Amino acid sequence: RYHHNLETSENYFAKVVTTHTYQDRIKTIKAAKRAGLEVCSGGIIGLGETLDDRIQMALALKELDVDSVPVNILVPMEGTPFEDRAALSQSEAIKTIALFRIILKSKTIKIAAGRESILKDFQALAFMAGANGMLIGGYLTIKGREVDEDLKLVEEVKMLWQK
């Protein structure tokens, strides 16, 4: 499996990444697919992009036919270019996951970085909205929850689905 996030929409990409182009990322994903690799590609929401940017990212991921889609939620951190961004609301995060599920019907959608600090006790709602996977442990810039806590969340979600 090859992991290579688009990060955001083509329209917003240059505001986030300056070392390479959006088309470079597209070419890399296509090359990985041609090589027969499963591709995990998603992005970060809450960078300052619009809802339309998020929809455009999901549509691009659909067109690329990636296998799984991690949805990271920005946690503004001091000392980073995005430290002054307002944290994305829980409702915006859940709405985005629901839109991704509508667009990416059969794909694995994983809630990832930011889920603990942004969604807090409402992480189960992400699964009700359409997520069907999650990344656990630590992330690039923030610590995740303990595995035992995530296993409890999985059990809670199972109970919700059984009702």
Language model regions located:
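Auxiliary Fe-S-binding modules of radical SAM enzymes
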Residues: 34, 59-163
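Conserved hydrophobic beta-strand within the GNAT/NAT acetyltransferase core sheet
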Residues: 4, 41, 109-113
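Conserved non-cysteine loop/helix-boundary elements of the Radical SAM core domain that shape
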Residues: 1-36, 44-65, 80-92
